[in-house]
């Protein structure tokens, strides 16, 4: 394992912050889509609640594991695997033809998000110092608020 820290630079910081938006937008965007999901999949109120909740549960359950995997196998690798898993799970959500398939895909999305998020914050903490670190963490927090709002649009 290579433990040397290389500053991500401006492009890297933008990539990390963009990656931060994916899981956070997905936290709130599903609420907007619930009406559109109800009729084609004949989803009950309980199933609609599960569509929202399973993502958060999978994210919370896998978050510490995602952080440890990033420490052991490399943050860049885990970030890329997380984005890939998240993207594939998003595609599966889009083509789901049953409520069970959608629930499974939402769970996978949460697991993918749990691989993405810890790599971002760890990379920022390890690679940046002083004012650059403070600015990056401020942007990280600001992106969280913006992403949640964007998801509701």
Identify the meaning behind each predicted range.
Residues 2-153:
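Transmembrane-helix bundle of Major Facilitator Superfamily
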């Amino acid at each position: 394992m290579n433990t040397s820290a290389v500053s991500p630079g401006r492009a890297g910081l933008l990539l990390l912050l963009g990656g931060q938006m994916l899981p956070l937008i997905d936290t709130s965007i599903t609420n907007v889509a619930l009406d559109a999901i109800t009729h084609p999949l004949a989803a009950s109120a309980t199933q609609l609640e599960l569509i929202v909740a399973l993502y958060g549960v999978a994210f919370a359950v896998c978050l510490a594991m995602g952080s440890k995997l990033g420490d052991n196998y490399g943050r860049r690798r885990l970030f890329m695997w997380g984005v890939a898993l998240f993207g594939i799970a998003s595609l599966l959500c889009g083509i789901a033809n049953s409520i069970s398939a959608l629930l499974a895909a939402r769970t996978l999305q949460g697991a993918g998000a749990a691989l993405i998020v810890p790599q971002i914050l760890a990379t920022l903490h390890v690679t940046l110092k002083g004012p650059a670190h403070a600015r990056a963490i401020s942007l990280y927090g600001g992106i969280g608020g913006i992403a949640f709002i964007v998801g509701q649009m």
